[in-house]
C-alpha cells in the first residue's frame, strides 16, 4: 500500500509546471486607505449566486457574479501576442474568461494598467464580436480576439480572450492587477469560448487535467499555481478528495459549519465555492452576523467589522466539515491586521436573494492559505490537505 501511495504521488507530480504568484495589497486595503471603501460597499453589495439562479437573460452577456474584484490579492504574470506583451493577472477559480485592457479602453482605470496593443502583435486576430462580462462591481465591455498566450513557458496558440474598451467603475483604478485569467469550468465562460486551462490540456501542453494552488501566508512571494501536476512537498498528510457538486464553479457540499462545538450555519448541509478570487469567508447574512457577534466584532462607519487585536488568541476556530473531515480555521487566519486601522474580521455577508435554493458559502484565501488545494478536472473533484 505504501508503494501505491508513492506511485500516486509520482504520477501527480509528473511534468509539473509551476507559476510563481505574488501577494499584493488588495483593492479593499487601497480603498480603505483612501477613505472610499464605504462608498464602494454601498454601491456593490456582494451577491454570489443571484444572477446565475435567475438565469442569463442576455445570451451576449457573461455573468460572473462572484467577481467583485475587492479582495483579489494573488497575481501571476502572463504574456499575450508576438512579440509578447506582459500582464499581471489574477488567476481566478471563480471565473472562466481571460481579459486584459486594450489600448482602445476609455476608462480612467486603463490608463493606470498595462494595455494590449494589437498593432504590435503579428499573431493577433480580431473576431469583431463584442463581449460583455458582468461582475459584482459592474460591467466590462470590449471585444473578442485571438492571440498567442504564454504562461510559465507554455505557449497557448490562438487563445480567445477579451480586450476591454470600458472597465467597471472608478474603483478599478485602485487594482494592482491588469486583468483576469479564469480557471473555472467552460460552462461559466463567455458563450463558446474555450478557457486557457482547457486549451493547455487540449493542445497537450500539460500532462494531467488538473491544477493546484499553494497560497503562502508568510511572505509576499512563495505562493504557487501548479499546472498539470502536484508537488507533495507543499502539503502534509494525504489529499482528501471531495466530488464537485456542481461543475460550474469549483463547488462542493459542506456538511456543517461550527464554532465552540455548536453549528453556526449550514445546519442541514450547504454548498461551498472554493475561490482563489476572494480573500474572505463569505456566507448568508444571518450566520455571518452571528459569527461577528461571537467574536465580538464591532461594525464600523467604514462598513467593515473591527476587532480588538488583543483578543485574537482567545477566539474560537471556525470549523468547516466537508465530506466528514473537519477543516478548522483559527482566529489568526480569519482576522486580518491592517497596517493602518488595527484588526478586521475576514467574514463578509453575501447579499442573498430569497429565490436561492440553498445556502452558499465562499471559501476564499483565508481558507486556501491553510489548505493546499487541487482542482481535478479529469475527475471533477477537489483535493484538500494541510498546507506546509
Swiss-Prot record:
One of its GO terms (biological process) is proteolysis. Disulfide bonds join 105-110, 266-270, 309-343. InterPro entries: Aspartic_peptidase_A1, Aspartic_peptidase_AS, Aspartic_peptidase_N, PEPTIDASE_A1, Peptidase_aspartic_dom_sf. One of its GO terms (cellular component) is extracellular region. It catalyses: Preferential cleavage: hydrophobic, preferably aromatic, residues in P1 and P1' positions. Cleaves 1-Phe-|-Val-2, 4-Gln-|-His-5, 13-Glu-|-Ala-14, 14-Ala-|-Leu-15, 15-Leu-|-Tyr-16, 16-Tyr-|-Leu-17, 23-Gly-|-Phe-24, 24-Phe-|-Phe-25 and 25-Phe-|-Tyr-26 bonds in the B chain of insulin. Residues 16-58 form a propeptide. The active site is at 92, 275. GO terms for molecular function: aspartic-type endopeptidase activity. Residues 1-15 form the signal peptide. Residues 74-385 form the Peptidase A1 domain. It is found in: Secreted. Belongs to the peptidase A1 family. This is Pepsin F.
